[in-house]
């Protein structure tokens, strides 16, 4: 009996993912604090050979009570949420740690918080979940892939989005909270930020009465290359905050 052909020898190193890393600076636009640094975020996005992608982010808000958040959020090859981890401290004290898992017809959460203790949640979904808000600024731009760019100026609605916290700073929980989302595509623009100059897409998150406190209008710019990398954000109203990509490092396989 003939011997089976030997399997081809694979190289010892396997580097078939592509990665990008960056820093988002948080500043104030209030007149009495104009351009004062009020926080920062360090993120990394890895896209694997099978098309799945994961964002890890460390987020810091210095405004009292300070917020520190660490997240790990993954999508499948079709940009559908699969799972997320969120750990949260407020005022330098532990608030909660939670793990979220998304199925085709329900979402679940296992969390431990300083207020509620150990909590298990299950939330039914009418359709598979399209997007999840974990409050990392880098991930805000990932919602925008759902918006039709052939309808500029029109309010478009994402019927269901789950949050890890309904608080504007994401400073509660983490636990599941369901809302819809209203977004306008403003249009393509050329944009220069601290990290460089980009072909960008401009969107605006508009009024949403489903939150316990209505969020002010939020403008977001992201890359126009299909990766939806966050470039800049501006929140109006009582918040008057600014978010800007100031550092960007692409791995060797990411592309230009």
Q: Where in the sequence are the language-model features?
A:
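Surface-exposed beta-loop interaction hotspot
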Residues: 105-168
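Acidic, serine/threonine-rich low-complexity disordered tracts
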Residues: 2-113, 158-256
């Amino acid at each position: 009996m003939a011997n089976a052909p030997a399997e081809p020898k694979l190289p010892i190193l396997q580097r078939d993912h592509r990665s990008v890393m960056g820093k988002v600076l948080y500043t104030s636009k209030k007149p009495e604090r104009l351009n004062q640094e009020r926080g920062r975020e360090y993120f990394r996005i890895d896209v694997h050979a099978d098309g799945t992608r994961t964002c890890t982010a460390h987020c810091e808000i210095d405004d009292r009570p300070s917020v520190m958040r660490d997240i790990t959020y993954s999508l499948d090859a079709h940009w559908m949420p699969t799972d997320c981890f969120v750990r949260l401290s407020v005022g330098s004290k532990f608030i909660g740690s939670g793990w979220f898992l998304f199925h085709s017809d329900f979402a679940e959460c296992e969390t431990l918080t300083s207020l509620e203790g150990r909590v298990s949640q299950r939330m039914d979904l009418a359709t598979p979940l399209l997007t999840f808000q974990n409050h990392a600024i880098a991930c805000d731009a990932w919602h925008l892939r759902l918006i039709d760019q052939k309808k500029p100026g029109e309010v478009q609605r994402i019927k269901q989005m789950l949050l890890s916290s309904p608080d504007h700073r994401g400073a509660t929980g983490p636990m599941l909270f369901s809302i819809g989302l209203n977004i306008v595509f403003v249009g393509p623009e050329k944009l220069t930020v601290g990290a460089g100059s980009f072909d960008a897409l401009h969107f605006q998150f508009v009024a949403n009465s489903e939150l316990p406190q209505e969020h002010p209008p939020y403008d977001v710019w992201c890359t126009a290359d299909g990766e939806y990398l966050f470039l800049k954000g501006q929140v109006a109203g009582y918040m008057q905050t600014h978010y800007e990509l100031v550092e960007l490092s692409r791995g060797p396989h990411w592309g230009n």
